[in-house]
């Protein structure tokens, strides 16, 4: 991320009492002096009565009425934000699935950041909702997933880096993560923390009696020192001068969640790569474990050239004909 000039926020329900994603996006837009786009994808099918003809304008009228209603709802939100000095525009599109629609509109408008509210109601509480997961997986643009409705108050931003470049992550991805974390922390008058997780060598890796407990402890100490040096080098390469470093000898999912909880982080910035097949299963499982265990917001940054491209053409409105039958008593 090289500055934030335009932010798209995916609005789920404009009439909702609280709009956490809009609130957070507005905070960032104000802090960065960025333009804010309120976007709603109309993904539900239009139901037409049985006597409405597709040929006599009934379909076009239904689409226009639906779209006008959505735009009025978004404009009501936009008016309040404009009074706070934020530049806001609204956009609605008949398109689906929702995650593809958001990515298409964000790409068309050349935004620098997508903000989306976490979906709830999944049948398994331990699994990330499909819409959220696919948006994070497919978007070439950084995505901020809002999980905590509370406003940012001098937030502690935690940047999760991987100097070991596990799973062939690009070398520059850590720099992007750290720079994004620093930009946001600075803009919101917060502080930056960085965490690097390394997997310590288990004692069971050595044959019984082949090595003393003191030697095992020495090996663990060296592993930690090596990991600490790598993190400091990553911070130096990214020209990060003010941050708090955390080096944890645990699985990344556990380490990130642990540090985020300890420091009461408001936002975790992490990287991810998209893969297919078995690699996707392995990498996705790690990423999903991290995302599910965090109660704070998460900003996911990915190498755009490694992301599967979403088709540019919109799918348009979905239609269904509603047949009205006479009531027989």
Where in this protein do the model-derived segments appear?
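Glycine-rich, Arg-bearing micro-motifs that act as flexible, cationic patches
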Residues: 116-134, 267-293
């Amino acid at each position: 991320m090289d500055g934030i000039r335009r932010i798209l926020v995916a609005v789920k329900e404009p009439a909702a009492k609280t709009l956490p994603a809009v609130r957070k996006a507005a905070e960032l837009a104000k802090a960065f002096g960025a333009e804010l786009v309120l976007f709603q994808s109309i993904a539900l099918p239009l139901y037409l009565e049985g006597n409405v003809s597709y040929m006599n304008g009934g379909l076009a009228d239904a689409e226009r009425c639906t779209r006008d209603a959505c735009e009025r709802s978004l404009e009501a939100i936009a008016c309040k934000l404009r009074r706070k000095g934020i530049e806001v525009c609204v956009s609605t599109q008949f398109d689906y699935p929702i995650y593809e629609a958001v990515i298409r509109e964000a790409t068309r408008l050349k935004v620098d950041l997508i903000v989306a509210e976490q979906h709830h109601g999944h049948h398994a509480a331990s699994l990330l909702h499909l819409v959220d997961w696919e948006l994070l997986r497919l978007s070439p643009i950084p995505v901020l997933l809002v999980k905590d409705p509370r406003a940012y108050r001098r937030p502690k931003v935690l940047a999760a880096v991987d100097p070991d470049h596990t799973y062939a992550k690009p070398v520059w991805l850590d720099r992007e993560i750290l720079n994004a974390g620093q930009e946001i922390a600075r803009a919101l008058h917060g502080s930056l923390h960085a965490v690097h997780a390394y997997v310590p060598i288990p004692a069971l890796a050595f044959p019984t009696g082949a090595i003393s407990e003191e030697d095992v402890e020495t090996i663990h100490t060296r592993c930690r020192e090596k990991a600490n040096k790598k993190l400091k080098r990553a911070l130096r390469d990214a020209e990060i001068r003010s941050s708090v470093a955390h080096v944890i000898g645990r699985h990344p999912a556990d380490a990130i969640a642990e540090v985020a909880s300890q420091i009461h982080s408001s936002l975790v910035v992490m990287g991810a790569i998209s893969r297919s097949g078995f690699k996707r299963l392995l990498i996705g499982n790690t990423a999903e474990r991290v995302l599910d265990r965090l109660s704070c917001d998460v900003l996911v940054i990915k190498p755009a050239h490694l992301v599967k491209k979403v088709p540019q053409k919109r799918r348009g409105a979905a239609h269904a004909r509603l047949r009205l039958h006479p009531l027989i008593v």
